[in-house]
Amino acid sequence: MWSKELELDYCMILNPHVLYVLPKLKAKGYKLTIASSSSMENIKKVTRQCGIASYFDCMVSGVDLKESKPDPAIYLDTLRRLNLKPEEVIAIEDSTYGIQACIGANIRVIAKEANRYDFNQDLADVIASDILDAYNIIKYWNLEENYFFV
């Protein structure tokens, strides 16, 4: 018996409309940040493989933090690094724990529907059907802030 390690093609599972929305946000002057529980190695691997790394101004891994989501530590750490206040940002999350972490950090959160998982997203400020819907919500809100965590 043999096994071969297969490389996952992350672009195949990239959220639809991400490649449309990221350039739109950057063109409007928004700064984008990833605040993920994944390792920095994995964050960089995925963003490079999908050709989206250059859109992000900051990438934060929660691996080195003592607490993980739903604890707000990763969001509080990112706010500290960027010298921002919670009211200056908005997060797009899909998981229950991610939404709870945003709430714990007093950050507004758009929940992107997670069809693959049975996440409770009721605590989010609003639920978007996909990333394009989240982008349209942001435009509707006409936010003056210019930082987003995803």
What is the predicted role of each segment?
Residues 23-26, 39-40, 44-150:
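Asp-based, Mg2+/Mn2+-dependent phosphohydrolase catalytic module
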